[in-house]
Amino acid sequence: MVRSKKYRISGVDLLDTLENWDRLMNFRVNLIACGGTALTLLNIKESTKDVDLIVPEKKEYDKLIKFLMALNYRYTGNGLAHDDDPNFIYQLWCGNRVFTTDLLESPLKENNHILVKKWSHIYLGALNLTDLIITKMFRGTHADREDCIAAFATGQVDAENLLDKYSEAARYDLNPEKVLENFVNLAEGLHKEQLINDKFYQKISDHLQSWGYEEGPSKGPEPCSAGDH
């Protein structure tokens, strides 16, 4: 299926592609969508530019790469692409690794993903929204922040659990201060959208300060002093 005139892929497009893969496969593989791909499959976003899929099992990952190469997918530097879909990059993550983050548990574990669809050979899930927010905010671009606000706005994310899991994951990061700063930015966005209340907003500040991170969520803009521009 050629979609080269489009620059974003919808959930329907992706399911069609995976169904085509499934027809040609002679092995089973578990795929867990993450990032914008998961948000698209869960109908939180309309479409995504890149296709991000976790393949938790190494043997399945190796088989899938071999299979895709046989279908003339080729590495582009950022992932795999096909001549029929040159604008779409398929990024496959092996094990518990997503973007710059190692998940604390396998995404295949119960409650760590949401079932999207099963075919004869492919099991497709979407990373649970708590872990999805963690992986996106560890990277922490503006687009990641907006996606995470949209995910939180579904009402399917427990704020207390998110704070606890994010803090635990930060302990294992090479730059914990940076990822905590990213969480502060997210908290400010959630508070602005009235998705968390003042009490929880302050709890985030207290929690981060207990970590030694002094810059908790801001209490609002400070008045400009003479000479400020």
What name fits each language-model region?
Residues 1-229:
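Compositionally biased terminal segments of proteins
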